[in-house]
């Protein structure tokens, strides 16, 4: 199932109705790219949520049963990548009419960093879209990459990073 901005916000509107208090959620990956209008839709829904709001979101999600996959990570973790503590401060606020959800997206450089960790062909395409749309510079990606934690083999991340930099920032 393909989810565009409207479907994502409809889903979050249903979650919003079930919440008993205000929470913060941060869209990652294709979800963030859809909300930032980099992509027209996403095939899955992914968030990283500060721990104090994680259970609230999960309870609401269980009640509404969205009918599509929703992956939720804790505190700046995104798949096998652990973003620095400032990921939330660097995130971008998405203006919505939601009452109990403060919706953010990862900063575009953090989207790129998390996609480098997995780096399949779709991730490469997403990285290219982010670099072009947000005019990301090689040094910004390198610097941010130095700050992250990686749950698999660090060498895999380093190799993926080098591959991305070589592909999208060829030496002049």
How should these model regions be labeled?
Residues 1-172:
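Compositionally biased terminal segments of proteins
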